[in-house]
Structure formats: C-alpha cells, structure tokens
C-alpha cells in the first residue's frame, strides 16, 4: 500500500515538473493543453486526471509550492537577520533568485501562464504578492522599534516600491524569454534601491 502511495506521489510530482518545464519552454507562452502535458509526461489524458481532477488543480499545486517556498524562506530571513536594510535586501534577492532558478514558475508569478486559465488562479498570485508586500511593510515599520529611528517616507509607499522593482525584474525575465536574469547586476542595483529607503 505504501509503495502504491509513493508511486502516485512520484507521478504527481512528475506531472508538475513536466508542467513547469513546459512553462519554461516556448510552449509556456501559449496555452498548455492537457493533451500536450500528457504527451510530455508520456501518459494518457485520463491518467493525468487520475492524479489531478483538473488542470486548474495542477496550477494550484504549483502555486502552493511557490507560496510555501517563498513564505518559509522569508520567515527564516526574519528569524536570522535583525538589520532592517539587510532583511529587505535578502527578501528582494530571494524573490529575484527564486524566479531565476524557476523560470517556468516565474511565468505563473507574472501571470503570463495564467492568462488562459481560471481567474481564481491569478487571484491566488495576487494574494501572495499582497502577503509579501505586507511583510515588507512590517519590516519597514519595525525599524523604529528595532533601531530607534524610522523612515521619513511612508512605509506603504516604500514596500510597494520594493515589490514593484521585483515584479518588474521578473516580468523583464519572462519578456526576454529568460535572457535577462533578475539577479544580474544586483549588487550594482541594490544601492539605487536602498537609496530610496529614507
């Protein structure tokens, strides 16, 4: 019985990995059908539906992976790092690095892969970005408590600026067909971003 569950879990992971790879390829700029996905995995469409009730559920699983990966790592950054600017830098670098290491998933983050799918999926991505922005805002607000001095600019504005930078770099990565990596020249860009944090 345990062997059967492991095989089922492995097949589910294989399906999700194939979907992510298809999103990374030129297929990712077009609607991905279950027929194409089944052919990529080497199974029938019926076999896909034995593991996932719908293609939407496949995207849900990929979004869950994205959420878990990012939120877990953000929490680790907040636990380990106490300096506000260092926290912000690490969170921004995390978002950019995650996108760079997972190009197919970046198409989901930017919404490109979800254009032909249910609106609910885009809503989940919107919620994820809202959570990240709220976390950035909280880090910015905690500066006054941690370091005795806050920012002169509204923390809401600063948080949205940081997130807009991340979203812009991820969109550029997708638009360039993954040529312009989000972390390229990050060490030169960060001082420009940090200079806005006043």
From Swiss-Prot:
Compartment(s): Cytoplasm, Nucleoid
A Pfam family that the UniProt record links to this protein: SlmA-like_C
Q: What is its main location?
A: cytoplasm
Q: Does the keyword Cell cycle apply?
A: yes
Q: Where would one find coiled-coil regions in this protein?
A: 117-144
Q: Which PROSITE patterns match?
A: HTH_TETR_1, HTH_TETR_2
The record's annotation in InterPro entries points to: DNA-bd_HTH_TetR-type_CS, Homeodomain-like_sf, HTH-type_TetR-like_transc_reg, HTH_TetR, NO_SlmA, SlmA-like_C, Tet_transcr_reg_TetR-rel_C_sf
A biological process from GO:
cell division
Q: Which residues bind DNA?
A: 33-52
GO CC annotation: bacterial nucleoid; cytoplasm
Task: Could you list this entry's UniProt keywords, alphabetically sorted.
Answer: Cell cycle, Cell division, Coiled coil, Cytoplasm, DNA-binding
Keyword Translocase listed? The answer is no
A GO molecular function for this record? DNA-binding transcription factor activity
Report the SUPFAM superfamilies cross-referenced here.
Homeodomain-like, Tetracyclin repressor-like, C-terminal domain
Domain HTH tetR-type residues, every copy: 10-70
The record's subunit annotation is:
Homodimer. Interacts with FtsZ.
This molecule's function is given as: Required for nucleoid occlusion (NO) phenomenon, which prevents Z-ring formation and cell division over the nucleoid. Acts as a DNA-associated cell division inhibitor that binds simultaneously chromosomal DNA and FtsZ, and disrupts the assembly of FtsZ polymers. SlmA-DNA-binding sequences (SBS) are dispersed on non-Ter regions of the chromosome, preventing FtsZ polymerization at these regions.
Which PANTHER family does the record cross-reference, listed alphabetically?
Answer: HTH-TYPE TRANSCRIPTIONAL REGULATOR RUTR (PTHR30055), NUCLEOID OCCLUSION FACTOR SLMA (PTHR30055:SF183)
The family assignment reads: Belongs to the nucleoid occlusion factor SlmA family.
- State the name under which the record lists this protein: Nucleoid occlusion factor SlmA
Q: Which species?
A: Escherichia coli O127:H6 (strain E2348/69 / EPEC)
């Amino acid at each position: 019985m345990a062997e059967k569950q492991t095989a089922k879990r492995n097949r589910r992971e294989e399906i999700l990995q194939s979907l992510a790879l298809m999103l990374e390829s030129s297929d990712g700029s077009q609607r991905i059908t279950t027929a194409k996905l089944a052919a990529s995995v080497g199974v029938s469409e019926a076999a896909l539906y034995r593991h996932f009730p719908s293609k939407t559920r496949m995207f849900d699983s990929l979004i869950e992976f994205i959420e878990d990966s990012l939120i877990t790592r953000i929490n680790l950054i907040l636990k380990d790092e106490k300096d506000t600017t260092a926290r912000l830098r690490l969170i921004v670098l995390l978002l950019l690095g995650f996108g760079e290491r997972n190009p197919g998933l970046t198409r989901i983050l930017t919404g490109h892969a979800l254009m032909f799918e249910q609106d609910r999926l885009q809503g989940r991505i919107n919620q994820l970005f809202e959570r990240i922005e709220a976390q950035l805002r909280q880090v910015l607000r905690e500066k006054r408590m941690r370091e005795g001095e806050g920012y002169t600019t509204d923390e809401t504005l600063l948080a949205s600026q940081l997130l807009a930078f991340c979203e812009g770099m991820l969109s550029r990565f997708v638009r360039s067909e993954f040529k312009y990596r989000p972390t390229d020249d990050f060490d030169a860009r960060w001082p420009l971003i940090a200079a806005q944090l006043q």
